[in-house]
Amino acid sequence: MGRFISVSFGLLVVFLSLSGTEAAFCCPSGWSAYDQNCYKVFTEEMNWADAEKFCTEQHKGSHLLSLHNIAEADFVLKKTLAMLKDGVIWMGLNDVWNECNWGWTDGAKLDYKAWNEGTNCFVFKIAKNHWSHMDCSSTHNFVCKFRV
């Protein structure tokens, strides 16, 4: 009996140590995990406001995509490039509610920039891996994101 408990405990320790090598969080079905965030590509085309509203309805804390470094941009690029015909997706970056005061819809700090000045809303041009101003009423695909 003692040997059985010892072996069982040993197997439990091995299992727990191996499970630590996997992601420490799980995203819902259909969402992809990266750096403590979950992402989902939507192939529907919507204007910026409708896409942001749609994202907020998908999961608690979900908003249009925010990008904080080139590694995250590359992750999104790889997830979206093959799926989307025009290679342009809405981002949560805007100054819709406060002119000239750019911010992410998820409230995150604007700590990474890759654009030239222009209109109120932004798209991520995937094939070129850069951001561009876009009329907020135009329709595009989008990516929703939430922090785990």
Swiss-Prot record:
GO terms for molecular function: toxin activity. Belongs to the snaclec family. This is Snaclec 3. The keyword Signal applies. Residues 34-145 form the C-type lectin domain. Disulfide bonds join 27-38, 55-144, 121-136. Interferes with one step of hemostasis (modulation of platelet aggregation, or coagulation cascade, for example). Heterodimer; disulfide-linked. SMART domains: CLECT. PANTHER family: MANNOSE, PHOSPHOLIPASE, LECTIN RECEPTOR RELATED (PTHR22803). GO terms for cellular component: extracellular region. Keywords: Disulfide bond, Hemostasis impairing toxin, Secreted, Signal, Toxin. Residues 1-23 form the signal peptide. It is found in: Secreted. It comes from Daboia siamensis (Eastern Russel's viper). It comes from the Eukaryota. SUPFAM superfamilies: C-type lectin-like. InterPro entries: C-type_lectin-like, C-type_lectin-like/link_sf, C-type_lectin/snaclec_domain, CTDL_fold.
